[in-house]
């Protein structure tokens, strides 16, 4: 966990989890609200996987309780290596709120399905989510390329890809 907020009125903001090796048997969360009926938001959480093995899912930001009313916004995941047995979520909301602005960037590794944003509630917004396969070149306003981006590594494997999804 970058942060695990267990109080109803607590918020998770700009927390990061990094995995570079070893084995994680459960889930990895950048920032997560696990309180029953949480009312605040999980904002800007991030998870970075560069090696090792994750036996569960990877979440940039998440709210785990179905009775929660907060939103998951601006969360991100970068997978550059390693293996994720489960699913990768930029943002995941099991409550009644939204999962918006999630970004997943994949430059390597092996994983199951990938979601930019996911909500468990029909009608809850999953807008503005992005999945990047590789990273972009840096371009100046004049149009000059100043740094090469990172392509997806050879041998990378990904299951299904979803920009946003409502349960």
Q: Locations of the language-model features?
A:
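Surface-exposed loop/turn motifs in large extracellular/passenger domains
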Residues: 1-27, 32-57, 62-87, 92-113, ...
